[in-house]
Amino acid sequence: METNSLENVISFEALYDSMHKCRKGVLWKDSVASFYMNGIERTMKLSDELHSGTYKARKPVRFTITSPKPRDIASITFRDRVYQRSLNDNAVYPTMSKSFIYDNFACQKGKGTDAARNRLKEFLHRYYRKHGHDGYVAQFDIHGYYPNMSHAVTEDLFQEKLPAEVFSMVKTILNEQYEGDTGYNPGSQLIQIAGISVLDRFDHFVKEQLHAKLYIRYMDDFLIISDDKEYLETCKELMEAQLASIGFELNQKKTRIYPLKDGIDFLGFKFSLTNTGKVLMMIRPENVKRERKKLRRLVTKSKRGEIPLEKVDESYATWRNHASKGNSHNLLQRMDAYYNSLWGEDYADNYQQRHESKRPRKAG
């Protein structure tokens, strides 16, 4: 059966598999648990509605989050998420991703933030071998990427690449859930795929016409490394024009050309190339400050009995695991000491002792 076959998207088997994928990490939600407990019946009903043409997507629930920065979120129902996941995995993503450049790293199998960071390290090592540690970085950020995404541009891109029956399904979802001429919200995989696809032509322009060899993009955060500042100025001008042609503007506060020696802020870390060619990856100071503030709040709540100690440990462990991906040995030692100090003498075991006690012992 062809990957883009309609049946490969809306069959019971495809939707049931999608349900299992969608429930990971969210089974604690009542709506998800209810659907999952009646999974066979609910999935059969969903498949029947899609086959008969009676399926209608429900309006997303919209809300705003404030951390780490204010952002509007649209959350779709679990039922709609199951369908969209199947449509994405079995039809949209396999087709749209065929033309992606290698250095487009968001929301793809085998890619992600870790892969993007490793690629930037590789670029810096490659640059040092050819040019040394002096150079320039052109770093770009698009103002209001998802809110300003053109519906016409997005639909044209999908229509160009997808089979007619698949495009019809995609267009129906987009039109039912998003009104007006611009603006999407990354509350579903389909919109995330739109997010990494809408700049596909732009990526090829940068790589093939501007000949930017050390170019990397993660959604709307992208950069070029070069030894030629004038070349980067020209790139910026031409790239800005290309983006304007599809309805985007650069965020001028975050878009700049600067010396490589200043270090590169990218995906939560600051990358520095030393004069010996070593690449250092350090977590941003503001991230550390934000985590310390969060820990103070969580520990206070735990001491009042509002949340269990284990939940606070889990939260810190998540941040610690993220920070440990960089050159953070000394920082982590200081953070461990700070975290333990928040609990005080009332807690006999420190974080490391609690953490070690949970590790399985070796046999023998």
Sequence positions of predicted segments:
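Active-site-proximal segment of RNA-dependent polymerases
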Residues: E2-S5, N88-F140, G144-P147
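Non-catalytic, polymerase-adjacent accessory regions of viral genome-replication enzymes
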Residues: M1-M44, R361-G364
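Right-hand nucleic-acid polymerase module
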Residues: I76-T77, R85, F140, I173-G180, ...
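Reverse-transcriptase-like RNA-dependent polymerase core
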Residues: D48-K69, V82, P163-Q177
